[in-house]
Amino acid sequence: SKPAIIDEDGIDPSIFNDDDGRRYMLLNRGARIFELNEDATKQISKAELLFYGDNKRAPEGPHLLKKDGYYYLFEAEGGTGPGHRITVSRSRELKGIYEPCPYNPIMRQNNPDEIIQRCGHGKPVQTQNGDWYMVYLCGRKIGDGYSILGRETALDPISWTMDGWPIVNNLKGPSALQVKPDLPEMIWEDESDDDFNNSYLSNEWWFPRVPEMDGIKLKDSQVHIKGSKYDLDTMKAKNILLRRQKHFRFSAVCKLCMPELYPGQNCGMTCYYDENTYI
């Protein structure tokens, strides 16, 4: 479908469909909400603040779930660093007073030595078997504390307390090992190789910036990259073709056909994070 432009400032949008058929969008700076038209392509009300969060620090990524007469509001709080967490609040009315969960944060890494850190942006899902899980973002750190694989997706079980609150993994934080859900197996086929036989690049390839006109072309099962006068240490360097690093340990092989290089010119493979960090 064609994209629908919603002219509202904010990030982390999510859609909530209420029982009466009305549709809403939520955005950050706390949990702001506004109503959409029937096909969710137009904003038809002003944004209102539902709740600014329990932690009151950088609340974002709001999601709503309606269950057993309550509206449950999930938010990511604490910033995207080590203090990142998931909190939940609830109200009997969509735009009522939201009560913070007494068990907040319902997901947070409390051990700085564990590999999985920065847990947030959680969204609850229920399987066809009735089991509940929390899908959330996290970062796996290496020895110096950096998460070189970026933000990754994790899954942990949700249980519901006697007083009707959702808690994740029994409040033990993220699990490095978890029981496999009783669901049909879906195997993801990773596209690790590319012989450039198509007329387009696959979605595995990325550019840090929009390439120059004819800067990168596919021809005769080869990818042709036009040279640039700019080095990798500047944001003006545009003709850079990259693939995301998905594993801590990996091998990368490519066949390069290079023209004659003159003093000051470079051509080859790079391990690239940004214009300040590359090898």
Describe the role of every protein-language-model region:
Residues S1-I279:
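Carbohydrate-active catalytic/glycan-binding domains of CAZyme proteins
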